[in-house]
């Protein structure tokens, strides 16, 4: 709803040099065309302050349906929104987030065609971002600020074979940051809004100093939750240093640090939010249903006698865990990258990216006395060194680890062929711990007693060693009117998990070692794009994809048997085949694209949800749904009519997506999606927009037993700034954004797929941003 144009994108060599992308995104180094062929693409026929060039808008020359959110569109986005919300305006993407900012990691869902968030590959400036799990993953929204993004380029069904990912079953989304500037300067912006939102952003540029250029930026976001007590606190730092040896050779270092913490808010059945739309955790410890003293249960003071001098648990009722204070999420992540590009010969280009990601963090959920007591009793009987629960326990989940890798490739232009080949290697480790600790007085407001563990649940390390190889040849024929791409890749992932998987390993089996090797050495991709005339193209593609099973840690940490004597069968790797056929046009007042798609899956894993008795919130588990399929179409376009003096333009996307498994529609997969908007630019200093989003009816589960109603949402913005006759400096701008303009209430906006637990749509939310560029 925040972006006006829904676009495709062609990654050119200039863009690769500008952005330093060593992701081996397809550079468009075509053979020389005749003058008439070149002239066809020199004119941009639809223009505006928030309109990109036509080749970006419609994915010119791409053999797959490639769409993008561009920098022009990002200029109108609300300050501080999640990187996932930038996908809302792209055709086919069903994005549901919690709150206007969308920063709550356990309230995000994305589906495109039949894929979900964990089956989409993400790449940032050539760095593969691994999996999108909140626990142990590398969700893209931790690593971007929209002020630094140049484009977000998505292939909804068939990403290029050169793009590195072990998670993708087809879709790839590349986030590309802006390059360093040749001129010194910077920008400062400040945002204020509802829910006590305050956000600052500052960026400083050195300019080009004898080939060396750099920038650094920092944003700080503080806000209350829109529903209930609790806050959001995010500090985000980005930096980039680039040295250019010549026009084709550079080295670039990038750094991102994200320090984030927020509080949970509850999900619930639809009936809960119909009764109380703002249902939330409590801002004080309740007395009713909470306070009930139990004496003589444990020798807390260690004098070998249980008597009146020992502590007596007081906070033993079930309602004690409805207090908000012990429901927090903390993440501290850093990403380092080093990009290098050079031309070995005039026709042979080498690119490489080395990277390291360090992850640390924890989450906390309170655990009730009764739930802790039952597990404590089991672990005492097993001889574990645990302490009787004191009341409400501190439910600590620790997450941490690192990823190190390198991506490298060569591109060789010979005659009418562009040959690309390369490799990716990554070594990832992830540490997960879970235990329940006592607190002073057994109160959620008490201090953590770090040497009193009420029970243990998990303590394991999982590793992923990934190797991907690829080879691709793009042949230009018929005087560059026909381009045919033939590619193949291989993927191998060695997965292992070592340690205490779950309760049974502590109580019965002891630490375990499990794992599996996932590999497919032949994953082909074939695509073609043909120029029908000066304005129209058709394209088609076919690809096979293979991925590490989603939720691998959750699956391999099932501890129902002793893995050394009775190992559980390992899940199979997920497989998919994707077919696309499409058309794009670029005319004087309109450009657009249309694509038909068909996708089939084998060994598709779908997420179900069960209610955790400790937290009373959904917890994911995974089911092999076997074979599934999806088919439909995606339409997108922009219309700027001449009779309105090119001051008004209309944009829209329409998606039909039928995704099913065993005859049942997949959960959280609406068949119809629509986004559209109207933008008005009467002067150089004013841009106004109103946008709408329609999400069709869908199901909460995989058996079509719980349907969710469709809903619509309007958003708007007004952007003031630029050349004017009022004496206001042209480098100063003021933007107003409104989300959920009509203040719609939708109790089932977000669903934990496979359950009937929901999160409601945020109310109307307003913010204003003042920006100064210098």
Labelled PLM ranges:
Residues 8-11, 15-16, 30-31, 256, ...:
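Conserved C-terminal beta-signal and adjacent last beta-strands/turns
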Residues 43-78, 109, 154:
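N-terminal periplasmic "start-of-domain" segments of outer-membrane beta-barrel proteins
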Residues 84-128:
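Extracytoplasmic beta-strand/coil segments of soluble accessory domains associated
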Residues 110, 127-156, 176, 272-273, ...:
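Short acidic/polar hinge/loop motifs at secondary-structure boundaries
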Residues 143-189:
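A beta-strand signature from Gram-negative outer-membrane beta-barrel systems
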Residues 185-187, 192-222, 227-304, 328-349, ...:
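Transmembrane beta-barrel wall of Gram-negative outer-membrane proteins
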Residues 339-355, 359-363, 531, 537-543, ...:
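Membrane-embedded beta-barrel scaffold of Gram-negative outer-membrane proteins
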Residues 415-416, 477-484, 589-591, 595-610, ...:
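Gram-negative outer-membrane beta-barrel transporters
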